[in-house]
């Protein structure tokens, strides 16, 4: 296991994209050792490739819902056949849950430990970020970086800071740097990095890097065997419901 984990908070706007590296080599401590902010999308493949020995936890949908992909493919040929349309009483559920949500999104929404509904990659502006990730993913593969959308193999996994914080029983609200220091008492950073933490994008990247550590330690919730095929198409959001202290071995 490598001693450094990276978190990447991705946006279509480089001024809202941040990457943070945490060094875990000192017992009982997670030290911020690198911050890249702002960060352009075209700079990300080389950055990840250069640090491929580390785990990367990325805040972006790795894929689209299976049903959404099928719907777009089928409807591109013409109107949907009557047999493919749910009864009218189920239209809202079909639109907002079955089409909009991936398997991993429904899990986070329904699990009583987490109860966080991710924004849908199929709808809203998040689709543009997911499309950008599709380009980054292709470039990473061309650099020889292994990509498993389920996040079980290779160096890269998907996460969602709001769900990660909720799973750690910290609520879903974004945390400031002082709040992160209170929630994760083992976090530390040199003063030169502190100006970067004024915005929430870098702080979100810190949460992603914490999830990367949890994934390294086998502490994140993984898809079940029967869910694995879908997770490898749609992506799987990694969060940990274990004690935060376990990130530093307590």
Segments (PLM) and residue ranges:
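RNase H-like (RuvC/DEDD) metal-dependent nuclease/polynucleotide-processing core
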Residues: 1-6, 10-250
């Amino acid at each position: 296991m490598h001693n450094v984990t990276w978190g990447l908070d991705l946006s279509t706007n480089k001024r809202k994209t941040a990457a943070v590296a945490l060094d875990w080599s000192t017992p009982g401590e997670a030290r911020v050792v690198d911050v890249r902010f702002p960060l352009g999308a075209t700079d990300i493949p080389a950055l990840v490739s250069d640090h491929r020995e580390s785990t990367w936890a990325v805040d972006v949908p790795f894929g689209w819902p299976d049903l959404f992909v099928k719907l777009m493919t089928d409807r591109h040929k013409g109107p949907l056949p009557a047999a493919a349309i749910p009864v009218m009483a189920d239209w809202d559920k079909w639109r907002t849950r079955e089409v909009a949500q991936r398997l991993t999104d429904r899990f986070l929404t329904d699990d009583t430990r987490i109860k966080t509904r991710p924004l849908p990659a199929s709808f809203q502006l998040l689709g543009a970020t997911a499309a950008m990730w599709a380009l980054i993913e292709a470039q990473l593969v061309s650099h020889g970086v292994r990509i498993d959308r389920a996040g079980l193999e290779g160096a890269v996994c998907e996460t969602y800071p709001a769900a990660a914080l909720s799973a750690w029983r910290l609520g879903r609200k974004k945390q400031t740097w002082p709040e992160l220091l209170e929630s994760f008492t083992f976090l530390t950073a040199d003063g030169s990095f502190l100006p970067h933490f004024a915005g929430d994008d870098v702080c979100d990247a810190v949460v992603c890097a914490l999830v990367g550590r949890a994934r390294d330690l086998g502490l994140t919730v993984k898809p079940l065997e029967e869910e694995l095929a879908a997770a490898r198409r749609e992506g799987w959001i990694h969060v940990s419901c274990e004690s935060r202290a376990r990130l530093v071995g307590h």
